[in-house]
From Swiss-Prot:
HAMAP family attached to this UniProt entry: THF_DHG_CYH (MF_01576)
The name this protein goes by in its record: Bifunctional protein FolD
InterPro entries per UniProt: Aminoacid_DH-like_N_sf, NAD(P)-bd_dom_sf, THF_DH/CycHdrlase, THF_DH/CycHdrlase_cat_dom, THF_DH/CycHdrlase_CS, THF_DH/CycHdrlase_NAD-bd_dom
Pfam families, alphabetized: THF_DHG_CYH, THF_DHG_CYH_C
Length: 284
């Protein structure tokens, strides 16, 4: 039976440590980390994510604000809002909730955020720093996965890691973080031929393809470590990941559950990066 990698418990532990660090920062430097979340439109899934981020920020002791903007806002108006918070010393982290409406150029908006306040790690300057081995702000899901692997003492050096999914949010930055740990990395996607055969060679398999229960036991080798990034609904409407958990858990050594695996760590890393941005602000 596989060890269940409990991301929720790890997140709670890290959040408690963060509360202590924030309290010390307030006492010593009179600084409260500040996070502003900018939400355009009324996407129901985005609203849930934003509420979760708000709760986590308040729990950590941050100064937190959500800016709700009309879906009809122009690109220029949105950039003006971002620029306002770029200049506001009360806020150390700026998060623009994605996706944005179709009439807004996402890359232009990501470029508008001050890289020092880009706690999502999506600004090209931060992605460039990651690729050059000098990461500061890293996309939160891959950062959270690395914390889970560290917590469970998963050896990466010399190991074969396979990632299903090539997004800028998970797949690509995940590959770079694993390379930094001297893993041999294969980045795959839905059009990779003989995908199950490729995945079956992995010591560490990270799945972020967005298809419910896509990965079955034929994809995994005996004793592998499996990280499931997906969050979907199965035919019965129950939350599930991209991995068929019940099938795969009998074959692997460790696996993250859905829910309670990667998800809680994503928000925790967002809070941690906001705290780190506040620390860096002391240096100017």
């Amino acid at each position: 039976m596989a060890i269940i990698m409990d991301g929720k418990a790890l997140a709670v532990n890290m959040q408690e440590q963060l509360q202590e660090k924030v309290a010390r920062l307030k006492e010593k430097e009179w600084i409260v980390p500040g996070l502003v979340v900018i939400m355009v439109g009324e996407n129901p899934a985005s609203q849930v994510y934003v509420r979760n981020k708000e709760r986590a920020a308040k729990k950590a002791g941050f100064h937190s604000k959500t800016v709700n903007l009309s879906e009809s806002i122009s690109e220029e108006e949105l950039i003006e809002v971002i620029e306002k918070y770029n200049q506001d010393p009360l806020f150390h982290g700026i998060l623009v909730q994605l996706p944005l409406p179709n009439h807004i150029n996402e890359m232009r908006i990501l470029l508008a955020v001050d890289p020092k306040k880009d706690v999502d790690g999506f600004h090209p300057m931060n992605t460039g720093n990651l690729w050059n081995g000098r990461p500061q702000m890293v996309p939160c899901t891959p950062a959270g996965i690395m914390e889970i692997l560290r917590e469970y003492n998963v050896e990466l050096e010399g190991k074969t890691a396979v990632i299903i999914g090539r997004s800028n949010i998970v797949g690509k930055p995940m590959a770079q973080l694993l390379l930094e740990k001297n893993a041999t990395v294969t980045l795959t996607h839905s059009r990779t031929p003989h995908l199950a055969k490729v995945c079956n060679k992995a010591d560490v398999l990270i799945v972020a393809i967005g298809r419910a229960k896509f990965v079955t036991e034929e994809f995994v080798k005996e004793g592998a470590v499996v990280i499931d990034v997906g969050i979907n609904r199965d035919e019965e409407g129950k939350l599930c990941g991209d991995v068929d958990f019940d099938q795969v858990k009998e074959k692997v050594s460790m696996i993250t559950p859905v829910p309670g695996g990667v998800g809680p760590m994503t928000i925790t890393m967002l809070m941690e990066q906001t705290y780190q941005a506040a620390l860096r602000s002391l240096k100017g």
